[in-house]
């Protein structure tokens, strides 16, 4: 039974990934900021997959001690981590001229440094799993904002570009150690983050919610929102034995937006 640690697991893409792994019989460590949200997700998983092994840990992604404590609790509850899914993130928008140092640091800390901290915590387990011939995996949920630029989210885009750079560099370091490292880059996805972005557009521009949603959908050549389950299936493939030679890649799930 694989032990999969998923951050930002209480909702959206993280919740979809958790359900996909639960259906494959994995043991799950689910981390997030809100215990109530994690508990609700646990109930959903229990209903869908009775008997699934789940450990919940409340974690502040930007606090090194909190991340270490969460990892240690996960390890104690379910054993060494075989797969790490760095999904937790945050997207705040602001024109660059109004992007102060607080916002800049927040975007880098949550989206990039948090990913670094989780990898550092779980890496000994992952290296051990790789040495044993297990399918040890790190998958970082980045964004199309890690592949291209978007106006008004310079700090977020800088952080996600950093995640892509980290993914590629670490993939080379671990290539001969049985651990693959890849990134998945969703376009605008039907999640709370996008719903918050729509609300922000409405507030700042006076557009209706439908107009704001249409503006985001327009980025996708297929003219649709990505669904969390689509992202989850990409993650599942990357974590499968079939993807053993896929390493250091940034896979866009965006209907062709970032070609």
For each predicted feature, which ranges?
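Conserved glycine-rich cofactor-binding loop
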Residues: 10-11
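Substrate-binding pocket helix/loop in short-chain dehydrogenase/reductase
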Residues: 95-96, 103-108, 216
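Active-site helix of classical SDR
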Residues: 119, 159, 167
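Alpha-helical segment proximal to the catalytic Tyr-Lys
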Residues: 124, 172-173, 244
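Residue(s) in the substrate-gating loop at a strand-loop-helix junction
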Residues: 143
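Short, small/polar-rich loop/turn modules that mediate ligand/substrate recognition or access, typified
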Residues: 175, 180, 246-248
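C-terminal substrate-recognition "lid" of short-chain dehydrogenase/reductases
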Residues: 222-253, 258
């Amino acid at each position: 039974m694989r032990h999969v640690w998923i951050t930002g697991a209480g909702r959206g893409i993280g919740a979809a990934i958790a359900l996909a792994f639960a259906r494959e019989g994995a043991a799950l460590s689910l981390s997030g900021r809100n215990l109530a949200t994690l508990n609700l997700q646990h109930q959903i998983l229990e209903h869908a997959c009775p008997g699934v092994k789940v450990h919940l840990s409340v974690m502040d992604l930007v606090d090194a001690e909190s991340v270490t404590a969460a990892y240690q609790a996960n390890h104690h509850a379910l054993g060494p981590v075989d797969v790490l899914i760095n999904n937790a993130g945050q997207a705040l928008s602001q024109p660059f001229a109004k992007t102060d140092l607080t916002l800049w640091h927040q975007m880098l800390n949550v989206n990039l440094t948090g990913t670094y901290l989780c990898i550092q915590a779980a890496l000994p387990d992952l290296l051990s799993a790789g040495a044993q011939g297990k399918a040890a995996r790190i998958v970082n949920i980045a964004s199309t904002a890690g592949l291209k630029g978007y106006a008004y989210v310079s700090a977020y885009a800088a952080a996600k570009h950093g995640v892509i750079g980290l993914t590629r560099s670490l993939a080379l370091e671990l290539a001969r150690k049985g651990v693959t490292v890849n990134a998945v880059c969703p376009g605008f996805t039907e999640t709370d983050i996008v719903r918050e972005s729509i609300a922000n557009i409405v507030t700042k521009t006076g557009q209706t919610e439908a107009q704001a949603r249409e503006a985001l959908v327009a980025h996708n050549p297929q003219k649709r929102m990505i669904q969390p389950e689509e992202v989850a299936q990409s993650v599942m493939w990357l974590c499968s034995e079939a993807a053993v030679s896929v390493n250091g890649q940034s896979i866009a799930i965006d209907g062709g937006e970032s070609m």
